[in-house]
Each structure stands twice: as C-alpha cells, then as structure tokens.
Amino acid sequence: MSRLRLATAAAALLAANAASAAPVSYGIDPTHTFARFSYNHLGLSTQLSRFDKTTGTVVFDKAAKTGSVEVTIDTTSVNTGSTVFNEHIQGPDFLDTAKFPTATFKSTAVKFEGDKPVAIDGNLTLKGVTKPVTLKVTNFTN
C-alpha cells in the first residue's frame, strides 16, 4: 500500500511540474500596451509616437523555448502628440487609414536566451503589404 501512495505522490508531483511548464498565454492589455514608433523629422529631431489601441495575444513556453505573438494595431489611433501630424500620418501618403484601418503582426519564431525571449521574428502587414521583421524584446518579466 505504501508503494501505491508513493507512486501516486510521484505522479502528482510530475503532473504539477508538467502543468507549471505549460505554455503561458497573455492577453495584451489595451490600457497599458502601446505599439511605439519613431521617425526622423526633417533631419532636425526624432519624434517618438504610438498607437493608442492595440489588441492581441502572446504565448510563451519557456521550457520548450517556443511561443507565438499576434497583434492587431488600430492605425486610426496614431498619437504623435499633434492633431495636425496625426491627420497627416493617417492620410493616403502614409498609413491611409481610410483604406487600411489596421496593421497586424504575426510571429513566425521566438528566440530565447535562457528562459527569456529576446527576439521575435514575424510578418508585419501594413497598408496591405506584408514584410518580415524582427522585434527585439527589451524587457520581459514573468
């Protein structure tokens, strides 16, 4: 009987370890997550801007060193700090938000150092054009 209890306890511990090593899914919190970008303005300054509406999911499996990221950005929510620049960037010369109200990113690979993600390869679709990009992970806390 004690061997059965030991086997049951061992199975429970293995199951607990397997559960803790399972992939972890994160929903992007749109009140605290902003896609940011910067651009050079006439060679005089670098403007830091953001999109105020971002949704998506992030999944990481640290044990398997895999993951996935899917993000949708509402391009009409661009925020440069200037209403005039916002309208200009939303226009047909740049984002053309009337025709393309969203941009998307879908990962193809996640690179890890130890148990932390450091880079995410994927495809960015902007104005109906998809191109490969690599996003650098600068901070990850679990």
Place the predicted regions along the sequence by residue.
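Low-complexity, acidic/polar, glycine-enriched regions of mature
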Residues: 20-142
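Bacterial N-terminal signal peptides that target proteins for export
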Residues: 1-8
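N-terminal signal peptide c-region/cleavage motif recognized by signal peptidases
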Residues: 16-18
